[in-house]
């Protein structure tokens, strides 16, 4: 749906300059992966010049009309998990916390974070059609206040930990949310731009700065803009 470049799916979205479009549909399960995609989002564009924001695709124009789009500019959520929630939203802390890695609230916050200019907090490298886990540990999200870590190493740790704890009662959520940053220090994963297993509720100050910058400067994003002249796509 989102990768189609023929323009046929643009009719399904409202004007991105006025609305953030969140599409709900059942994702096709990948044939080559044991995991299932929960959501996907377009990243915003940034205008070349003084208002350019690192980590985003640069363009020369400050205004784009919906009629000029060749693809559905939006965030998409896998509707298969629309009713999946961790118990922190339902029991108000009256009983023990039951974690759900497919929590729809976290997925939506995560994808809207991407839509407004945020990258994953773990180390990743850019490839032709997106990003992939990095082999080493470095800061790749353009936010100095979000500790980075090696996602591949964490996945290996997670797989080993779960294989050694076959019964659910023996699993400690604190062991699963633990990460090791590039300096070898441990921290708890709570940022919305991390993957499971994490608490998924924090946004850092640097991330808020990026979001504000996108809201005030990027085309195809609703809301008032900082004056960038009147140049637009023809």
Cite the ranges covered by each PLM segment.
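Structured segments of extracytoplasmic/periplasmic soluble domains
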Residues: 111-115, 119, 214-221
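Metzincin-family zinc-dependent endopeptidase catalytic domain
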Residues: 1-109, 115-135, 139-143, 147-148
